[in-house]
UniProtKB/Swiss-Prot annotation:
Bilayer-crossing regions: 195-215
Protein name, per record: Ankyrin repeat domain-containing protein 46
A UniProt-annotated Pfam family: Ank_2
Cellular compartment(s): Membrane
Primary localization class, coarse: membrane
ANK repeats: 11-40, 44-73, 77-103, 107-138
Lineage: Eukaryota, Metazoa, Chordata, Craniata, Vertebrata
Protein origin, superkingdom: Eukaryota
Gene that encodes it: ankrd46
GO CC terms in record: membrane
Keywords carried by this UniProt record: ANK repeat, Membrane, Repeat, Transmembrane, Transmembrane helix
Disulfide bridge map: none
Alphabetized PANTHER family for the sequence: ANKYRIN REPEAT DOMAIN-CONTAINING PROTEIN 39, ANKYRIN REPEAT DOMAIN-CONTAINING PROTEIN 39-RELATED
Bilayer topology: Single-pass membrane protein
Length: 228
């Protein structure tokens, strides 16, 4: 057997729980279909899901889940169904439906710790170990992502504070932004070619004024000789 019962009895006065112990799928199904409470407990606080999982009755676990059994239910020791099972298919079913592999009971024991203590088969142990390792890696990735997000937020906050503490920087950014907006509106209103023609005319007028004032034609041969 790949499981060890924990101070268990093979008899109970509750029909559904007895069906879960015996692995009687058809009887359990009839009881559930006639309205039996899927979360009914025994004197140790264990539900049918606990008892079916402990014996590897995964089909009964599925039916209990289908009829509303609480997968997160714990017994009076804080054990989930996953703490009591030692079968690969039952472990896979419970984990795939939301049970956490690293959840601890009232004594701080995880399903893996109890499985090793009970001496379940090696395949179940390896599965639990692999699932715990995945959980740890996922937690580390999540923590790293949160740390990066916090660092980015702090950096943005520092930049904003620097901008607020430096009014000259803030004013210059505002002036540049205003100038860009005004220039874009100006170009859109006149049209690109008209603006280009206007700039050419302004440039020619500037050259004419320079010649009138200095008497020297800009970019003339004499100016180039002086430069050399």
């Amino acid at each position: 057997m790949s499981y060890v019962f924990i101070n268990d009895s093979s008899q109970t006065s509750v029909p559904l729980l007895q069906a879960c112990i015996d692995g009687d799928l058809s009887f359990a199904r009839r009881l559930l279909e006639t309205g039996c409470d899927p979360n009914i407990r025994d004197h140790r606080g264990r539900t049918g899901l606990h008892l079916a999982a402990a014996r590897g009755n995964v089909d009964i676990c599925r039916f209990l889940h289908k009829f509303g059994a609480d997968l997160l239910a714990t017994d009076y020791q804080g054990n989930t169904a996953l703490h009591l099972c030692g079968h690969v298919d039952t472990i896979q079913f419970l984990v795939s439906n939301g049970l956490k592999i690293d959840i601890c009971n009232h004594n701080g024991s995880t399903p893996l710790v109890l499985a090793k203590r009970r001496g379940v088969n090696k395949d179940a142990i390896r599965l639990l170990e692999g699932l715990e390792e995945q959980e740890v890696k996922g937690f580390n990735r999540g923590a790293h992502s949160k740390l990066e997000a916090m660092q980015m937020a702090e950096s943005e906050s520092a930049m904003e504070s620097h901008s607020l503490l430096n009014p000259n920087l803030q004013n210059s950014e505002g002036v540049l932004s205003s100038f860009r907006s005004t220039w874009q509106e100006f170009v859109e209103d006149l049209g690109f070619w008209r603006v280009l023609l206007l700039l050419v005319v302004i440039a020619l007028l500037s050259l004419g004024i320079a010649y009138y004032v200095s008497g020297v034609l800009p970019f003339s041969a004499s100016q180039l000789e002086l430069v050399h």
